[in-house]
């Protein structure tokens, strides 16, 4: 197989590593059976607190970044870089280690963007964070961040491959948050800081 195919496969496998599940397991907790059942840092925060959540967030961000670094090391084209970024996110969302189930892909999307375009990532981050702090809804901040990244990629005149990559990542974020959107409309969405019983 070519370097491009190998890199796409590696990106998917990097993304598939379920840090949340692995960290929670060290505490004797099955993360898929507590809170929202999601494997990401937000559910780890609800179940186990800030320390484990930050470890998971760090890992989920940088596994996306590592995939991009590997692609650059192989000298792949810009469009392939975008493909590698998306494969890392898809790996997180549909992990081969979890029977093709997974998380929502926000941290991994941010990680890939941070290594693809640090300026765009660092413009996007405070926008999403502000919404989270104002509303205490992580889901709302995540979706706002996805939209902001796409709009900013257009406003800053980024190349087509990058705009397309960011657009697809934003679509994936909305897709994985479809149940959150429903709960937001119904007023039943959990807010940041609400704890759940870890078991």
UniProtKB/Swiss-Prot annotation:
Query: How does this protein sit in the membrane?
Result: Multi-pass membrane protein
Where does the protein end up?
A: Cell inner membrane
Which keywords fit this entry according to its UniProt record? Cell inner membrane, Cell membrane, Lipid biosynthesis, Lipid metabolism, Membrane, Phospholipid biosynthesis, Phospholipid metabolism, Transferase, Transmembrane, Transmembrane helix
Q: Name one Pfam family in it.
A: G3P_acyltransf
The terms describing its cellular component in GO are: plasma membrane
Gene Ontology molecular function: any one? acyl-phosphate glycerol-3-phosphate acyltransferase activity
Q: Known EC number(s)?
A: 2.3.1.275
User: What GO biological process, any one, is recorded here?
Assistant: phospholipid biosynthetic process
- Name the pathway it acts in: Lipid metabolism; phospholipid metabolism
Q: What domain of life does the native source organism fall in? A: Bacteria
Q: Does the keyword Oxidoreductase apply?
A: no
Membrane-spanning parts: 3-23, 50-70, 78-98, 113-133, 154-174
**What InterPro entries does the record point to?**
G3P_acylTferase_PlsY (IPR003811)
* Function in brief: Catalyzes the transfer of an acyl group from acyl-phosphate (acyl-PO(4)) to glycerol-3-phosphate (G3P) to form lysophosphatidic acid (LPA). This enzyme utilizes acyl-phosphate as fatty acyl donor, but not acyl-CoA or acyl-ACP.
Q: Which HAMAP family match?
A: PlsY
Q: Which family does it belong to?
A: Belongs to the PlsY family.
The record describes its quaternary structure and partners as: Probably interacts with PlsX.
Instruction: Give the PANTHER family listed for this entry.
Output: GLYCEROL-3-PHOSPHATE ACYLTRANSFERASE-RELATED, INNER MEMBRANE PROTEIN YGIH
**UniProt name for this protein:** Glycerol-3-phosphate acyltransferase
- Organism field: Thermus thermophilus (strain ATCC 27634 / DSM 579 / HB8)
Gene designation? plsY
């Amino acid at each position: 197989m070519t370097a491009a195919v190998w890199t796409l496969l590696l990106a998917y496998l990097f993304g598939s590593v379920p840090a949340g599940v692995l960290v929670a397991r060290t505490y004797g907790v099955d993360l898929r059976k507590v809170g929202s059942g999601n494997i990401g840092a937000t559910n780890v925060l609800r179940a186990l607190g800030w320390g484990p959540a930050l470890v998971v967030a760090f890992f989920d961000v940088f596994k996306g970044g590592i995939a991009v670094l590997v692609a650059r090391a192989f000298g792949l084209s810009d469009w392939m870089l975008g493909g590698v970024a998306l494969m890392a996110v898809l790996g997180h969302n549909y992990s081969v280690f979890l029977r093709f189930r997974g998380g929502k892909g926000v941290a991994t999307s941010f990680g890939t963007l941070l290594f693809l375009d640090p300026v765009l990532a660092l413009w996007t981050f405070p926008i999403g964070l502000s919404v989270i702090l104002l509303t205490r809804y992580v889901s709302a901040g995540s979706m706002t961040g996805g939209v902001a990244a796409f709009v900013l990629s257009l406003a800053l005149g980024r190349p087509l491959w990058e705009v397309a990559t960011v657009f697809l990542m934003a679509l994936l974020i909305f897709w994985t948050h479809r149940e959150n959107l429903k709960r937001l409309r119904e007023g039943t969405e959990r807010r940041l800081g609400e704890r759940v019983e870890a078991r």
